Design a protein with these regions (language model features):
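Active-site-adjacent substrate/metal-binding segments within catalytic domains
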Residues: 4, 8-160, 175-176
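Extracellular glycoside hydrolase catalytic/binding regions
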Residues: 146, 156-187
Length: 187
């Protein structure tokens, strides 16, 4: 759906904004798996980077649609949008095609103790810009962030802060992280 809000002054439009939204329900159950609109919905997924040879990240609607068509041709119904905010065009395509989306911020590979403010800003913007997309069902906090180990107290604190922020801004969606197992078993 598209919701349009118009600001009138003396009967004339002085501002107008439109936003897309949709309605759905989901649950994640340890025994039943992913449940979409009350029914089991097995997830078959891909991970997507938003780039192409020769044009980098400057994809047009044509390339986004080509990517979505290929993803659908594979039979996928789930997309992890790695590792950064993607184009609104692609989020809209995900909504239109009924995809289940994992959206995440660029908090990748190695934790930078001085980078907390940046991760908080990135997550805030991701949620503010995309919370109306019904295709997004999970917010990703980080990707393979334990490459230097998982025992750094500031890494753990940053994840707690991000997790708390997400649940404050959007209590309807869970959080997740992608983990690379390069940690000692004791960490």
């Amino acid at each position: 759906y598209t919701l349009t809000v118009t600001l009138l002054q003396n009967g004339k439009t002085v501002d107008e904004i439109a936003t897309r939204f949709g309605c759905r329900s989901f649950a994640i159950d340890p025994q039943k798996g992913f449940i979409l609109n009350g029914k089991p919905y097995p997830l078959r997924g891909v991970s997507r980077h938003q780039d192409r040879p020769g044009i980098g990240n400057a994809l047009t609607a044509k390339e986004h649609t080509e990517d979505m068509d290929l993803i659908c041709e594979l039979g996928a119904n789930t997309i992890r949008l790695a590792h950064y905010q993607h184009s609104q065009t692609f989020y809209d395509l995900c909504d239109e095609r009924g995809m289940v989306v994992w959206a995440e911020i660029p908090y990748i590979s190695r934790h930078m103790p001085g980078g907390k403010a940046n991760t908080i800003s990135q997550m805030t913007e991701l949620i503010c810009q995309n919370s109306n997309h019904p295709s997004i069902v999970v917010w990703g906090l980080s990707n393979e962030i334990t490459m230097n180990g998982a025992s750094d107290p500031s890494l753990l604190e940053n994840h707690r802060a991000l997790n708390d922020l997400v649940h404050k801004m959007d209590p309807t969606r869970p959080t997740t992280i992608a983990v690379l197992s390069m940690c000692d078993p004791g960490e």
